[in-house]
From Swiss-Prot:
Changing residue 123 to D: In OI15; reduced capacity to activate canonical Wnt signaling. Glycans are attached at residues 29, 316, 346, 359. Ligand for members of the frizzled family of seven transmembrane receptors. Acts in the canonical Wnt signaling pathway by promoting beta-catenin-dependent transcriptional activation. In some developmental processes, is also a ligand for the coreceptor RYK, thus triggering Wnt signaling. Plays an essential role in the development of the embryonic brain and central nervous system (CNS). Has a role in osteoblast function, bone development and bone homeostasis. Belongs to the Wnt family. It comes from Homo sapiens (Human). Its main location: secreted. This is Proto-oncogene Wnt-1. Disulfide bonds join 93-104, 143-151, 153-170, 218-232, 220-227, 299-330, 315-325, 329-369, 345-360, 347-357, 352-353.
Length: 370
């Protein structure tokens, strides 16, 4: 008789549940490990001797997978671009959610966004999309700036483009940015569960948004600015424009399930497809963000969920929107206090060359959640 048969029924059932949950937990813990390199771009431990020689002493690089480290080695100069893109994505995330209960908090160390990424909620969807977009955006821009040895401007668009303009200049290399972003970011995902599919979908949604927001820029040529001929190229959007689009997609995100529920004849490709939880809704497009788990309310502190709550947050007493005290403070009320602030004012430029200012003191009214 085996040891398993000697265990009480409730113990064996508990162990079975724990073992079943283990692969998903491991996959969740491995997701986003590359975010730990966020400070590499400003690290003194990274020494770059030339574009063709990098000496890396940064401990956080151990958080990368073997494939990710290989991609870094094969593309000298790209590590700073990846880290810089991640930093920009973090700033954009904080900006987009600055007036909401969840305000994209971050922490030092390998777990940049905290425990919220262990949940399959909307907030996790946005985090994956904006960080993926940040890498694609930064790498594409670095290519056109000549900061990465393995890529340049996108010179494929050449020749006449229309009756009064032609392609020229230095287009941002969005194709290289998307390809590298897909290879680098997606390789950090492990497993074949719903979380895996959700993360991959949202990663791609971030990259797709950067691509779809590309714009054509032109420069005029001709006598006295007559603009008889124009030279045009493709330019990346600002990351703020990408963040605005992704925040709108966050508000309209699709709740999903595995595809082909109840079918025993589904192929592997069909099983690895996301379908809306509500059959009346259309399937998510490549631009949409997807999630499968309801978000916490973020009102109170929870160590288990990694939520800080909204106590002490500044709110707008006259706003009915998400930044208003009623919604942001979750109905708990708010306190009002005054603060005397001294700022520079009435500044004047003197030739040549200095600026003189006065110090002005005024009273600021602050409202904070209880």
């Amino acid at each position: 008789m085996g040891l398993w048969a000697l265990l009480p029924g409730w113990v064996s059932a508990t162990l079975l549940l724990a073992l079943a949950a283990l692969p998903a937990a491991l996959a969740a813990n491995s997701s986003g490990r590359w975010w730990g390199i966020v400070n590499v771009a400003s690290s003194t431990n990274l020494l770059t001797d030339s574009k063709s020689l990098q000496l890396v002493l940064e401990p956080s690089l151990q958080l990368l997978s073997r494939k990710q480290r290989r991609l870094i080695r094969q593309n000298p100069g790209i590590l700073h671009s990846v880290s810089g893109g991640l930093q920009s994505a973090v700033r954009e995330c904080k900006w987009q959610f600055r007036n909401r209960r969840w305000n994209c908090p971050t922490a030092p160390g390998p777990h940049l966004f905290g425990k919220i990424v262990n949940r399959g909620c909307r907030e996790t969807a946005f985090i994956f999309a904006i960080t993926s977009a940040g890498v694609t955006h930064s790498v594409a821009r670095s290519c056109s700036e000549g900061s990465i040895e393995s890529c340049t401007c996108d010179y494929r668009r050449r020749g006449p483009g229309g009756p009064d303009w032609h392609w020229g200049g230095c287009s941002d290399n969005i194709d290289f940015g998307r390809l590298f972003g897909r290879e680098f970011v997606d390789s950090g995902e492990k497993g074949r569960d719903l979380r895996f599919l959700m993360n991959l979908h949202n990663n791609e949604a971030g990259r797709t948004t950067v691509f779809s927001e590309m714009r054509q820029e032109c420069k005029c040529h001709g006598m006295s600015g007559s603009c008889t001929v124009r030279t045009c190229w493709m330019r990346l959007p600002t990351l703020r424009a990408v963040g605005d689009v992704l925040r709108d997609r966050f508000d309209g995100a699709s709740r999903v399930l595995y595809g082909n529920r109840g079918s025993n004849r589904a192929s592997r490709a069909e099983l690895l497809r996301l379908e809306p939880e509500d059959p009346a809704h259309k399937p998510p497009s490549p631009h949409d963000l997807v999630y499968f788990e309801k978000s916490p309310n973020f009102c109170t502190y929870s160590g288990r969920l990694g939520t800080a709550g909204t106590a002490g947050r500044a709110c707008n007493s006259s706003s009915p929107a998400l930044d208003g005290c009623e919604l942001l403070c979750c109905g708990r009320g708010h306190r009002t206090r005054t603060q005397r602030v001294t700022e520079r004012c009435n500044c004047t430029f003197h030739w040549c060359c200095h600026v003189s200012c006065r110090n002005c003191t005024h009273t600021r009214v602050l409202h904070e959640c209880l």
